[in-house]
Amino acid sequence: MRGALKYLFLLIPFWWTAGLEAQQLPIYSQYILNGFMVNPAMAGHDGFTSFNLTARQQWLGFKDAPQTYSASWHTRLLQRSHRIVGNPLRRNNMLIPSTRGRVGLGAYIINDANAQVARTGVSFTYAYHIFLNNQQLSFGLSAKAFQYRIYKESLTFGEAGDPVLNGDFNTVAYSPDADFGVFFRSFDYFVGFSVSNLLQTSVLIGSNELPDFKTYRHYWILGGYRFKMGEELGLEPGILLKTTENWNPQGDLTLKVYYSDLFWGGLSYRTNRSIIALVGVRIDGLYFGYSFDWALSEMAHFNYGSHEISLTFKMGDNARRYRWINRY
């Protein structure tokens, strides 16, 4: 798997030179802190029960700029038991507590608004984790449903008699869909692949004179490696590559520095010519992350950047994180 991770980093130059178009799914800068929103296989992957709240304001100060709010939860169904150490036929053997569990569950609620169009949805996830010595291979499947809404009263129509804009106008539509993901992790590195909008459903919204709005499959590749630099410091380069079936790629290259797993900071470069600053702090089981995106284009003159806040609460002691790996 380390060879696959190296190959993943070799894809970066090619991905960086490809074109970029608008995508239908929201953008996240704190994707490492809440990877479950990107890959359903990460539901319960670390053994914690996690609750996350994320708020993102794109292009602050720009009228009708995109806004995203989400609340998510995922957990591992753990089974506590005991294992025998020594000869089970003798009386001097020992019973040592052990923790097992292969099933992860998760759910989220999201509201994503962009100008006069809003999307609100729910998702439910089932994940299955397979132990491979001190590594783990995970699969996840999500079923989701969304409501799309157009705020017609805020639209500006061109001509009063335009049949496209002033005919039968569906302001609300509903769409079911599904996501699938694979995730592999070790103590010091991780890599994942996921597909969103598997069903590519059509959304009957807007004027009947226009073709149906179709959701496109989105493909995500996530990877990272943690380098230990002494007792307290850690360095983690990471990448997030995403595209649609029409080949509209976008990539994030991130470098984060950790101090004793209590503080972290880093920088990301996104292929839409954005620089992202990330900072975070952990207080016991509470994780707080903030990111600031600054465009390197003319767009920067018309807004005050993009801001994202992520708050995560993880239940369970620190040792629980890898206790399920040593299952024998």
Task: Give the residues covered by each predicted segment.
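Positively charged n-region of N-terminal signal peptides that target proteins for export
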Residues: 1-7
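Sec/Tat signal peptide C-region and signal peptidase I cleavage site
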Residues: 18-22
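Bacterial N-terminal signal peptides
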Residues: 7-17
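Subset of outer-membrane beta-barrel
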Residues: 23-328
